[in-house]
A protein has these predicted regions:
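Conserved P-loop
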Residues: 1-71, 114-125, 138, 159-166, ...
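Residues at the starts of beta-strands that form the adenosine-phosphate
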Residues: 30-33, 105, 132
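Conserved P-loop NTPase "ATPase switch" module shared by AAA+ and STAND
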Residues: 74-88
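Conserved AAA+ ATPase "SRH/arginine-finger" region at the nucleotide-binding site
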Residues: 132-142
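Conserved ATPase-coupling elements of RecA-like P-loop NTPase cores
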Residues: 84-95, 113-120
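Short Cys/His-rich metal-coordination motifs, predominantly Zn2+-binding knuckles/fingers
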Residues: 143-147, 183
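Conserved catalytic/switch belt of AAA+ P-loop NTPases
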Residues: 96-104
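Structural recognition of the conserved hydrophobic beta-strand(s) that form the central parallel beta-sheet
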Residues: 81, 104-112
């Protein structure tokens, strides 16, 4: 039994990592139970784990996790994989049941922060419970030189949609872009990164006048 946590921004290869993990364990004869959230229908209406290159593996799509404990596929599994973990409100009790009670191996994959750099869902609550935590990075879409992207920036339209709904929206390259710290801060708060103008030098004659009046 073990718990591995894979976190990072969008376009960091998390779905590709899931596919690699699943195929590797299936090649060893393991029964693998893969879960994704039902609200993620970006690429297909079928329950699948899909990366941005459109490679797919079958999964169970659900709005919550605890009811899945009754499914025979779960009971027969040796490895449980949870994708889009940030969307599951019952993530922590489910994972504790899987690992601590049912003694299975579990891999949880999700965004650690939203487009505002706030903790996303219950993902970070799993850090103290994990055997291994891996922070993946994407490549900054602005640098163009392989600089690591730590954060996800929402486009103007997606940000407005999220604010109107009160929750982050599901989207892909049309809605979000991975950025390094510098370009994220530039896009979010350009004023903060604008150098302050040098202090205006007081003309010498003004200083002399001030000194005379002071006397």
């Amino acid at each position: 039994m073990s718990l591995e946590l894979l976190i990072g921004p969008m376009f960091a290869g998390k779905s590709s990592a899931i596919q690699s993990i699943v195929r590797r364990h299936q090649s060893l004869g393991w029964s693998v139970f893969v879960v994704t959230h039902s609200m993620d229908t970006r690429y297909t209406s079928e329950p699948m784990v899909v990366n941005h290159d459109m490679q797919m593996i079958p999964a169970v799509a659900a709005p919550s996790l605890m009811p899945l404990l009754e499914r025979p596929e779960y009971g027969a599994s040796r490895l449980v994989v949870v994708e889009e973990a940030q969307f599951f409100a019952d993530l922590v009790p489910f994972v504790m049941r899987v690992v601590d009670t049912d003694r299975k191996h579990c891999v949880v994959v999700g965004l650690d922060g939203d487009a505002e750099r706030r903790p996303f869902g219950r993902v970070l609550d799993l850090v103290p419970l994990s055997d291994k935590v891996t922070k993946l990075t994407a490549m900054c879409a602005r640098c163009g030189d392989g600089t690591a992207a730590l954060f996800t920036l929402a486009t103007a339209s997606e940000s407005a949609a999220a604010n109107g709904a009160g929750v982050p929206c599901v989207g892909g390259a049309e809605a979000y872009v991975p950025l390094c710290r510098h370009h994220y801060l530039t896009a979010r708060s350009p004023v903060l990164l604008t150098p302050s103008p040098p202090p205006t030098e007081v003309p010498r004659q003004v200083i002399d006048v001030l000194q005379i009046h002071a006397c």
